[in-house]
Amino acid sequence: MGKVIGIDLGTTNSCVAVMEGKEPKVLTNPDGGRTTPSIVGISSSGERLVGQIAKRQAITNPQNTVFAVKRLIGRKFASQQVKDDMNVLPYQIVDGDNGDAYIELQGKKYSPQEISSFILAYIKKAAEEYLGETVTDAVITVPAYFNDSQRQATKDAGKIAGLNVLRIINEPTAASLAYGLDKKSDEKIAVFDLGGGTFDVSILEIGEGVFEVKSTNGDTHLGGEDFDLLVIDYLADEFKKDQGIDLRSDKMALQRLKEAAEKAKMELSTSVETEVNLPFITADASGPKHLNVKLTRAKLESLVSDLLDKLEGPCVTALKDAGMSASEVDEVILVGGMTRMPAVQERVKKIFGKEPHKGVNPDEVVAIGAGIQGGVLMGDVKDVLLLDVTPLSLGIETLGGVMTKLIEKNTTIPTKKSQVFSTAADNQPAVSIHVLQGEREMATGNKTLGRFELVGIPPAPRGVPQIEVTFDIDANGIVSVSAKDQGTGKEQSIKITASSGLTEEEIEQMVKDAELHAEEDKKKKELADARNNADALVYATEKSLKDLGDKIDASTKENVEAAVEKLKKALEGEDVEEIKRLSEELTTASHKLAEAMYQQASAEGQAGAAGDPGAGQGAAGGAAPDDDVVDADFEEVKD
């Protein structure tokens, strides 16, 4: 078994780590960064861009650049969260054939799983380059409060990227692993995880290598992106007041505003005031317009006060579900870039009554924990036991549209639970099992995970047939449900792949597309390399021709010039083999030039030697015998 990488697939940034010996190590990407922007762009030529390069072109290509795709993964197009996002995101969100939210880029529809797979494939390749070996196995993190559809969709994204996802692990749990791996004493900790798009809080008991999650809560649609939107609105409103122009209707200006808002928010974590300057943000008949707005930390905090208030509820619920008071929590671990904001830290201090622990890197700690979990699965990390929980209750719809819970939220996973139900009408030949996830009393208020039928029930009065329904949750938090007629032994089961989600066929097709794209990338690189080499060869040859001028014979010059022209023509096309063949021809023809240059240099050297001052006299004087010269005898004198 090769290395198992741990990936934090974040809303804003992603990070990858691996166990090297006994230590987890964050791997750098080809740009040298320890985190990679979770951004994908499709250029006008159809080229796929991921990470920093996609971020750099976002301003000029906002409609074909996707960020924050994690907020859409596993969600229905008709859901309120997607509707909210459609109002603020510059790219087009469309209805998929299965009812999921899809994204349209350059006229083609992509599922959020596919977009996420592009980021994962980039990270996989970066890890392979760093480690110098092929990587197939991975642990991927998700927000603790992700439902089954979102977990399954994340696993599918990994599969499309060519990864064997060994485990889906909750982000706060991963962070606790990174924090507590070397801790020997027992501790009760709270992990407060506020990232780019999601918010989680988990309460754990850790000690002696056991990490037991007692409860988890959160909001999968609350994070840094929401804070940014409020700053964007403020900047746009200020500009409208000043210039009478609403920048929100201009997608390019909106993208510049987004970048400026994010930067200002980050700057205000360390300073109390910043200035947002965006020259040439737009123009009207009177000429170009510039945005210049001062923003103070106090103003930012007043803008986002409602979001700060939303952080309290999940913390209080998590403590209550864990059966703990805030004073019993020994440490509060801050995770996610948004926890750098002083107002967030103050709110955490107020909720838990203590200063939060700032000893971990909030951007990297989740990936490090995932890397450690990879080490556990490989057997490299010993004596670590992870006991996670299911974040939401699971059950089925029963008579009257009620949700009957079989597995309560915060139940330790993996787990299996059965309950016997019966028919609601006389001689009922089949039962429809409607699988639900959530905390509401009525079925309509909860998330539908799937439906299936158990047929062939023998005629009997209502209440007589015994139908055993079994829920099974694996270590990834992914659900399977079965129903069995105890009278006939007939059984029907379903592995929940979400009521929509991607089918196996769609996933396989996307895997093939990804492999095809990798092959295309390889061909593009080969073409680029061949072109670069050919360009360099043409330049060097033309320079040599110019330098030699008339010092080479006409036929050699003609042959070389013809070879140059042929190669130049080939460079206009995309035939790699033709470019390589003509490059070789030009190299062979250029050898004649090299010979001519060598001969010229040699001739110049000889001519130079012949023309040295006094050389002729010296040669004549030394070579010609002189009749007047007499050879001298000598005798050795001994004392």
UniProtKB/Swiss-Prot annotation:
PTM-bearing positions, type Phosphothreonine: 198
Q: Which GO molecular-function terms appear in the entry?
A: ATP binding; ATP-dependent protein folding chaperone; unfolded protein binding
Low complexity bias: start-end ranges: 599-610
Q: Where is the composition biased (Gly residues)?
A: 611-621
Which parts of the chain span the membrane according to its record? none
Q: Where is the composition biased (Acidic residues)?
A: 625-639
User: What highest taxon heads this organism's lineage?
Assistant: Bacteria
Instruction: Return any one Pfam family short name.
Output: HSP70
* Keywords linked to the UniProt accession: ATP-binding, Chaperone, Nucleotide-binding, Phosphoprotein, Stress response
Q: Which residue ranges does the record annotate as region Disordered?
A: 599-639
Q: What causes induction of this gene?
A: By stress conditions e.g. heat shock.
Q: What the protein does?
A: Acts as a chaperone.
Q: Which PANTHER family match?
A: HEAT SHOCK PROTEIN 70KDA
Against HAMAP family, the record matches this protein to: DnaK (MF_00332)
The record's similarity note reads: Belongs to the heat shock protein 70 family.
Protein name from the UniProt record: Chaperone protein DnaK
Native source species? Desulfatibacillum aliphaticivorans
